[in-house]
Amino acid sequence: MTIQEELEAIKQQFSCDVSLAHSSKDLFDVKVKYLGKKGIFRGFADQLRKCPIEQKATVGASINACKQYVEEVLLERGKAVLAKEEAEEFLKEKIDISLPGSEEAALGGKHVIKKVLDDVVDIFVRFGFCVREAPNIESEKNNFSLLNFEGDHPARQMQDTFYLDPTTVLRTHTSNVQSRELARNKPPVRIVAPGECFRNEDVSARSHVIFHQVEAFCVDKDISFSDLTSMLAGFYHIFFGRKVELRFRHSYFPFVEPGIEVDISCECHGAGCSLCKHSGWLEVAGAGMIHPNVLRKASIDPEEYSGYALGMGIERLAMLKYGISDIRLFSENDLRFLRQFS
């Protein structure tokens, strides 16, 4: 039998072996049989050395062509077998959703932050506010400049704000909704803006680098400070489910004038407890009348229109409503904690 006849016989036998290989292991065995260190094609090396010089080129080309054919068939067959095996494995792992679920696998529920956030927004919607959102990644202009933060204001510094580049930040408050909405909508406007905020702070029991905030603002003719205080009283009465006393302390915020810190009476009724640090009061929000400069930057005449704005931290409200002492619990994914609110 000549080498050419032998190669043809090998191709026929190889085709038979491949057709009977139905798994990756079968194909690997075929590959070893033909292409392995002790495989069939290794035997042709000795035959090629014994060939007359004038036949070596032709014989070598025939051997290589046959070997290449074997490699290509193995590759294509391997793809088909692998796809078949993956499909079979997928069917084995597929969950039969028609089966009844385990009673132990209870349905999940809203995270306590989501629950409180929805409750807060729902109250403002009942008060006639529209829900609006803005990006977490914000321009320095919308986050600071349009809200009357001067260029040297401490809040702009790297130690308080996460800068992505010299003019882009992770928003430090949801007040960026105010700068955007006042620029595109003329009064009257009543907006509530929920969302995540980011500040470069040390993580502790009372502060975190990521927190949730709701800002609400109203701009119209003849809006007064009493409109703000009456709205706050109504909100906290509904949210806490009890009548609360409010206390206002003068404070400074660049985007409002006058600015106030809002405190509510503690459930200890002034007796003093660890929650209120024995003061009888709980700090819940910052608020005030929108600064005339903010209105001017939005092309709104402060002589004709006025407005109020307020911001409240959702984690803070959740901690007060449910008696939670550590803000870090909200992000630790401890089911023992989370299941209390689902």
Curated annotation (Swiss-Prot):
GO terms for cellular component: cytoplasm. Its EC number is 6.1.1.20. The keyword Acyltransferase does not apply. Binds 2 magnesium ions per tetramer. Its main location: cytoplasm. GO terms for biological process: phenylalanyl-tRNA aminoacylation. Transmembrane segments: none annotated. It comes from the Bacteria. The keyword Phosphoprotein does not apply. It catalyses: tRNA(Phe) + L-phenylalanine + ATP = L-phenylalanyl-tRNA(Phe) + AMP + diphosphate + H(+). It is found in: Cytoplasm. GO terms for molecular function: ATP binding; magnesium ion binding; phenylalanine-tRNA ligase activity; tRNA binding. Mg(2+) binds at E257. Its cofactor is Mg(2+). Belongs to the class-II aminoacyl-tRNA synthetase family. Phe-tRNA synthetase alpha subunit type 1 subfamily. Tetramer of two alpha and two beta subunits. This is Phenylalanine--tRNA ligase alpha subunit. It comes from Chlamydia trachomatis serovar A (strain ATCC VR-571B / DSM 19440 / HAR-13). The lineage of its organism: Bacteria, Pseudomonadati, Chlamydiota, Chlamydiia, Chlamydiales. The gene is pheS.
